């Protein structure tokens, strides 16, 4: 049984700790992202999500408003729970929540995640770039009628 909750870090510190644990495992430990880059000044302004699988937090994400629209960020699923469709469930929930805001929806995708986001209506924009020593493309959600 899957459950997805949304929260603010400053309102639900117990959920913030669970989200940070997933991000630590995926980004800092697996991908060697510098913790100073992983945890930033936007933690308390972003809306965060946790996906629970049988009451265990296994995936997280966040979104925030920027000058360029709504930026989806920090999508991470624990290694043990990948390729089970959980990322798609989480992405769909986030998109359901932000789509009514009528703003551009975009993200910075690691190269290996591009096919996942393309399956969900995102397209690559511009040139490849490095963020936290990992190659990325900016991607934008195309309007779906």
Predicted regions, residues:
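Short amphipathic alpha-helix that is part of the acyltransferase structural core
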Residues: 1-43, 48, 52-53
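Conserved beta-strand in the GNAT
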Residues: 50, 56-64, 71-76
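A conserved beta-turn-beta hairpin within the catalytic core of GNAT-like acetyltransferases
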Residues: 65-73, 82, 101, 132-136
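Conserved acetyl-CoA-binding loop-helix of GNAT-fold acetyltransferases
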Residues: 77, 83-96
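Conserved catalytic-core motifs of GNAT/GCN5-like acyltransferases
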Residues: 123-138
């Amino acid at each position: 049984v899957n459950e997805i909750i949304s929260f603010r870090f400053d309102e639900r510190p117990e959920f913030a700790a669970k989200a940070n644990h997933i991000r630590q495992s995926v980004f800092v430990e697996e991908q060697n992202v510098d913790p100073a880059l992983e945890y930033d000044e936007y933690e308390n302004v972003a809306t965060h999500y946790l996906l629970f699988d049988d009451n265990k937090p296994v995936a997280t994400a966040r979104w925030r408003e920027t000058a360029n629209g709504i930026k989806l960020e920090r999508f991470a699923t624990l290694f043990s729970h990948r390729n089970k469709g959980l990322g798609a469930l989480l992405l769909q929930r986030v998109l359901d929540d932000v789509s009514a805001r009528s703003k551009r929806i975009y993200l910075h995708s690691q190269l290996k995640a591009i096919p996942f986001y393309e399956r969900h209506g995102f397209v690559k924009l511009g040139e490849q770039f490095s963020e936290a020593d990992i190659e990325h493309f900016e991607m934008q959600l195309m309007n779906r009628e």
